[in-house]
Regions:
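Active-site pre-lysine segment of PLP-dependent enzymes
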Residues: 1-3, 12-43, 57-58
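A generic "structured core" feature
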Residues: 2-7, 65, 82, 109-113, ...
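Conserved core segment of the aminotransferase class I/II
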Residues: 30, 34-100
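Conserved PLP-binding active-site segment of the aspartate aminotransferase-like
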Residues: 55, 132-138, 155-191, 195-196
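Conserved glycine-rich beta-strand-loop-beta hairpin in the small C-terminal domain of fold type I
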Residues: 83, 100-110, 120-134, 144-147
């Protein structure tokens, strides 16, 4: 149907640790059918809360006409600072520094989860700032979350992100994020999780 659009939410795509970066679908869109969404919450600072949208040319008029009724909750000063940060080339340098920091945290976490081999399978480790832990020992998501909580560690069950019911193979899956922790805390937390899981 020619009147339909694809919405591409390119969250965390800046952080890829293995292989070449995966190009955005929007970059291949010769027909103007992809609406591209992104955010600076991981790459710059969560507190800024600035997102962006790249619209196909044919939707720009509609946005100008109807999008005016939405007011931005982001201060004009923050928007101008980000604009200048981007236009002066600081963002790319900052992103390279953040990639190195997150890659180092990522590597520390994976190294300290080695003892879980056979207990679980890890996925999502090639990009982003979190991993999925798929338990193969019969542990449920609820049990894994509870055991982590007892250790003072917050992990999330995959079911909290699902639109519908999870398939049976996904019911023992948790999300383990590492963006906000330093390497030492990551190592300590991973060792404690390995003991209880």
């Amino acid at each position: 149907d020619a009147s339909r659009y694809i919405i591409e939410d390119d969250y965390d795509s800046e952080f890829r640790y293995k292989g070449k970066p995966i190009p955005a679908l929007q970059g291949f869109d010769a027909g103007g059918k992809v609406i591209y969404l992104g955010t600076f919450s991981r790459s710059i600072a969560p507190s800024i809360r600035i997102s962006y949208m790249v619209l196909p040319d044919q939707l720009m008029g509609v946005y100008r006409d109807k999008g005016q009724i939405f007011s931005s909750t982001v201060s004009r000063v923050d928007q101008l600072i980000i604009s200048r940060f981007l236009s002066e080339g600081h963002y790319e340098r900052h992103l390279n520094r953040m990639r190195a920091i997150y890659k180092s945290r990522h590597d520390v976490l994976l190294a300290h989860l080695q003892s879980l081999e056979g207990v679980c399978r890890i996925s999502g480790e090639n990009a982003g700032v979190h991993l999925l832990i798929h338990f193969q020992n019969g542990m449920t998501e609820l049990r894994a979350v509870e055991l982590a909580k007892r250790e003072g560690i917050k992990v999330y069950g995959l079911s909290g992100c699902a639109i519908g019911p999870l398939r049976q193979v996904e019911t023992g899956t948790v999300i383990l994020g590492y963006a906000t922790l330093g390497e030492e805390k990551i190592a300590q937390a991973a060792e404690r999780l390995c003991r209880v899981w």
